[in-house]
């Protein structure tokens, strides 16, 4: 009875449906006995398909759920939505990529060389580690230390790609399913 028909081009129908139900005042409670097994993507190219689609759906949901941005009406639900989803899909990627040129500008404008120079050096080191992590992943070499900055940058780049995906895929909620690694059945 709480189900509502989604717009046909909805990318994250389960997410939007859940929040629309919560916006009506219902609590979302998950069954503790329910479980699902989902294997990881077959490779990073397949993972990119997922991340771009999820990011596009997240951006789409910001527009579709814009009423939820009203903290006077939805209180804690608004805070949870904005802090867990909206910032990650909108502001964080833009600010991440603005940090490098802004840090350089502050340093060139006479900002503290010790403070901003150190921050800039650490930032460049982080990007180099991410690039090196990417390079190693193309060679099927796994390095946890380098994978962390690589995956962080990978996720934020895919949010930016999600903007383009959303713009190009207007009118369709269909998406290409990412290939997955094989998962063993629990019944074996």
Where does each model-flagged region fall?
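Intrinsically disordered, low-complexity segments enriched in polar/charged residues with Gly/Pro
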Residues: 25, 31-33, 47, 136-139, ...
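Membrane-embedded multi-pass helical conduit in multi-pass membrane proteins
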Residues: 38, 88-171
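Generic alpha-helical propensity signal that fires on short helical segments
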Residues: 44-49, 54, 90, 104, ...
């Amino acid at each position: 009875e709480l189900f509502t028909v989604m717009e046909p081009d909805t990318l994250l129908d389960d997410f939007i449906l859940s929040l629309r139900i919560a916006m009506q005042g219902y609590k979302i409670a998950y069954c503790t006995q329910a479980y699902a097994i989902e294997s990881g993507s077959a490779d990073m190219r397949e993972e990119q398909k997922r991340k771009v689609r999820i990011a596009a759906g997240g951006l789409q949901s910001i527009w579709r759920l814009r009423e939820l941005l009203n903290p006077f009406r939805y209180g804690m639900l608004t805070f949870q939505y904005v802090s867990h989803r909206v910032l990650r899909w909108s502001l964080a990627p833009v600010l991440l990529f603005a940090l490098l040129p802004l840090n350089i500008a502050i340093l060139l404008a006479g900002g503290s060389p010790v403070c901003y120079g150190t921050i800039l050096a650490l930032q460049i080191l982080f990007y180099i580690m991410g690039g090196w992590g990417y390079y190693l992943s193309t060679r099927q070499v796994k390095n946890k230390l380098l994978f962390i900055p690589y995956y962080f940058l990978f996720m934020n780049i895919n949010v930016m790609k999600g903007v383009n995906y959303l713009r190009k895929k207007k009118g369709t909620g269909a998406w290409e399913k990412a290939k997955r690694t094989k998962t063993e059945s629990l019944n074996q």
